[in-house]
Amino acid sequence: MTGLVLVTGATGKTGRNLVAQLKESGLPYRAASRHGEPPFDWAQPATWDAALEDVASVYLVAPPTVDDPYARMVEFLRSAMRKGVGRLVLLSMASLDAGAPAHGQVHQWLMDNCADWAVLRPGAFMQNFSEGQYLATIRDEDTIYSNTGAGRAAFIDAADIAAAAFAVLMAPEVLNTDFVLTGDESISYDRVAELISQACGRRISHTHISTEALAERFLARGLPEQTAKFLAAAYQRIADGPEGQITDAVRTLTGKPATPFQAFAEANVHVWTPAEARLRGP
């Protein structure tokens, strides 16, 4: 589908990569932002219609800082359909089927109400280690704290998710399906620690903690309580097994293989380097 693409979550892990790909391709897009023109604010529905003006398709990322974000997303989707938006693409999670809590509720709503939709269901993001929940303790404590035990995940690079989103948004045909997006290898957090250790040249360990303790760590980082508990429960699913599945959806949609974790680790050594070591230089 061609036409103006509205990218929500435009400064997030996948959104900024999608914006870059749209810009590089010379395609029209609007990066949804409170500071954009027109402004867009999840907490202010009065801003939505202007942001949706002349939009052909929407890339939909859950807002992290509003109460009951999934009800808010459905409200926004109703507005999008009233404005004549043709295609709606939701970023969900591999572990959440249609009808499941949270993103799964929005997935089900799209199936029941939308004529042209797609849902991207990525596994765990590689970027959780380089700019998310695990960055600070890797950099400052040489430790990854998780509740995943020996569970495995097929970690995926956010750039690969964005490339898949680009392909789905531009697809000439109606898709009306979901895609489980994963990397090409299923590895444990112990193995993640080994790969980051090899890339950084120092030992990074993996320490198992309870789901409750992990949620408390997320709260201490400033995440809202609902988000902290949701994320901790999501990581618990890795210990339970479902995140270990591997699919070829990235290659099918983009024509390219998924990024290996080793390549990701080698490209991100600088973010895990303690400040004093960066100041000293080589």
Protein language model features and the residues they cover:
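Conserved N-proximal alpha/beta basic substrate-recognition cap immediately N-terminal to
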Residues: 74
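Cofactor-binding loops of NAD(P)H-dependent oxidoreductases
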Residues: 40
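A short, acidic, flexible beta-alpha connecting loop/helix-capping segment that sits on the rim
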Residues: 34-36, 253
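Catalytic nucleophile serine of serine hydrolases
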Residues: 92-93, 257
